[in-house]
Amino acid sequence: AAASEKGYDAMHGYDYVQLVSKFTMGGVFYHQACDNYLDEKMNADNKPNDKPYKDGAYYTGKEHSWDEAFGYWGAAAHGATLSPKQNYDITKKKNMRDADANGDGVVNLKSEMNYAHAYYAAGFDKGGNTDYYNTITKAFIDGRQIITDAKGEKLSDAQRRGVKRHARTICSNWEKVIAEAVFKYAGSVYSNIEAVKATMGGNLWQVSGSTAKAEHEAALRKYAKYWGELAGFSLSLHTSGVNLGEIGVKMDRLVGMGPVMPDGTQVNGMSNGAYTVASGKSMDGFAVHMLKLQNLMVEEFGVEARNNDKISGISNLAEVLGSGNSAEND
């Protein structure tokens, strides 16, 4: 990545900026919240509620742990009072009026801005088919209320069960938000395969002429961007502490270790610090992988927003998904 040109490796189709940033959201935020603060730190013998988090702290161990997880979620403190479009536009800096909850004329980036997966949730919710943002944020608020109501005493078994129930709501919906992103970017990769092919004419991957070459390189750049986002989000699904088993294996094989390039190559591993590549791959076959991936997100994760849907309009979907020329990557 360090040797690439501004984070872009044109030979292998890697956009490291997108790949690393999207995976970091999952590998840090989602992982820390769902495999740490909302998991073992909610156990009776971990970060007790009848003791300060640390010497001099005015909050308990449980309060700190729950609040830390909420911070990783990334929602504005007043986000639950806004519509999905308002929350989405706040992050896009298109609606600073609604971001300024206390009306002091400035936006507090700590409490009045949406970040990370909360932003993506709002983006999916504004389509009207889901309510991820409010479901997760309300579960955070309700779980925190249980901890607050304990008034610095140990949580009872019933209180702890309630807290863990809200934690499950948070993490199951958070997983679906990430799965929605996988669905979305699988659709983007699918579309950009067609865009790349459209710049190749009858010369396969050999593009001549300055204008044609520029168009081809621009299409490849966007293709790499979307694959990087897809790979980052799909890898994130592995980080909650829940073993995805065969579903995860299938997802990883469909995404691949890199996108299939116009010359039929695709990264398939590393040796002595350098990428190894397979040859003879098909971009058309990889496009079918993206359809299979969208179908997997529907069947196994129950995504409902389905932004950038490429499978609903295919009348012979079962036939396409069973295509023999799109065998999954080994």
Predicted regions and their residues:
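Mature extracytoplasmic or organellar-lumen-exposed domains after removal of signal/transit peptides
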Residues: 1-330
